[in-house]
């Protein structure tokens, strides 16, 4: 069958990953809960807000890398808390220095504190500089397919459209824009922000996303470690459903059992 989908590896910056779940490190009660939840998630890529989390820039304070060692996890420094391109570029340079030349970064440039929507103009400016400086840029963006295309053409290695506002747990608010982005994508597309529970993650994967990044959905759950495990299974289920191909939707019923040979 020509429409049968075959799985392909999840590759970022030349490295292949088994888990398609990426997780954040903020909002947990303490370091131990952070460690346990991330272990339960099965994630291999962990994103860290460089401006809010100590990864070596504050000697003498607890260092997140003590519980999430870079030899076990791929650390994905992000620019959360940056509101212009200059701040974002400076933060990425600091992260590269702290992580011994590490080039993989998650770029996010926010528009305001109320919505945490991406400022796409500043994001485009920052992305252009970072790509020229040799960074492997994964970029948080709006669900505008044109902006996503421009970021990919600029050289970003992955685009990460929001599913809903950061921290809201509203789920996949605009699956139609996301579908357009996926259809046009020349780089991996990861849903970033808005996921609230396991079914949201599954829907994102069923649509064809390469992976999902989340933080609040796990950290704000009543039992974060249990939710982390639920998310691990949700990602796998969604990917398998995408590869399997769902049945077509119909307006009218269709009997599961054949009508031929009915007992009279």
Curated annotation (Swiss-Prot):
Subcellular location field: Cytoplasm
Keywords: Cytoplasm, Schiff base, Thiamine biosynthesis, Transferase
Catalytic activity, reaction form: [ThiS sulfur-carrier protein]-C-terminal-Gly-aminoethanethioate + 2-iminoacetate + 1-deoxy-D-xylulose 5-phosphate = [ThiS sulfur-carrier protein]-C-terminal Gly-Gly + 2-[(2R,5Z)-2-carboxy-4-methylthiazol-5(2H)-ylidene]ethyl phosphate + 2 H2O + H(+)
InterPro entries in alphabetical order: Aldolase_TIM (IPR013785), Thiazole_synthase_ThiG (IPR033983), ThiG (IPR008867)
Residues given in the record as 1-deoxy-D-xylulose 5-phosphate binding sites: 167, 193-194, 215-216
GO cellular component: cytoplasm
GO molecular function: thiazole synthase activity
GO biological process, one term: thiamine diphosphate biosynthetic process
One Pfam family from the record: ThiG
E.C. number: 2.8.1.10
Root EC class: transferase
Active site: 106 (schiff-base intermediate with dxp)
Pathway connected to this protein: Cofactor biosynthesis; thiamine diphosphate biosynthesis
Top-level taxonomic group: Bacteria
Main location: cytoplasm
Family of the protein in this entry: Belongs to the ThiG family.
Function, as annotated: Catalyzes the rearrangement of 1-deoxy-D-xylulose 5-phosphate (DXP) to produce the thiazole phosphate moiety of thiamine. Sulfur is provided by the thiocarboxylate moiety of the carrier protein ThiS. In vitro, sulfur can be provided by H(2)S.
Family matches, as PANTHER family: THIAZOLE SYNTHASE
Assembly mode: Homotetramer. Forms heterodimers with either ThiH or ThiS.
Name of the protein this chain belongs to: Thiazole synthase
Organism: Pseudomonas fluorescens (strain ATCC BAA-477 / NRRL B-23932 / Pf-5)
Record lineage: Bacteria, Pseudomonadati, Pseudomonadota, Gammaproteobacteria, Pseudomonadales
Gene giving rise to this polypeptide: thiG
